[in-house]
Amino acid sequence: GQRQRVAFARALAPNPELLLLDEPFAAIDAKVRQELRSWLREMITRVGITSIFVTHDQDEAIEVADEIIITNHGHIEQAGTPIEIYSQPKTPFVTEFMGSPTRISNITSFHGYEELGEGLHAVVRPEHVSVTKKTEQSRFSSSVEEGVVERVMFRGREVELHVRVHDVLLVANRRLEEASITEGERVNVFIYQVFAFPAGENGTQNVNIVENANIETEKLFYI
């Protein structure tokens, strides 16, 4: 990481009006790269130079940038703050580019999404999927799907679960302190939210955020 710091200092020496950084952390291990991202963000803010940071790493873009521009084959798909880009994607490309999404072509077969209609694709992210053991109490017990865990991966503070539901392999995260789930186990799955768009279209304003229709009903029942 020291070489990158020196190169950055040299680039700042002439006091440029604009700084271009093209994949500056591409050949660095993960921990050093994370440290350099924080350091670079602090330095750019302190010096006050407008910077263009080119990267294929979504985490780098989200952490370092004030504004992100996502391009696809030379076309600008969306521009906005990191929160806007991540939480309100405007095109199918952006929806599937950010996070760790799963595309679902048969979303109407899932509880709470039956009314969406045919001809829609949906994208779901791990943070919008709840996986619980059969023995655990769930607020949405009447709306869950049954799934089978195909893979469990340790991720430090949490585990990543790959769960097969309706021939779709969903990805979800579960806190490490929660009861362990094993491969091959049958579990309950609930999808809180999806990003939906017409199949085969790639317009600029055709992605809708759709919440599970059973959430409000289950909340009233639970209270």
Residue ranges and their predicted role:
Residues G80-E84, E96, G117:
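Short, surface-exposed loop/turn motifs that are enriched in glycine and acidic residues
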Residues G112-I223:
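Non-catalytic connector elements of ABC transporters
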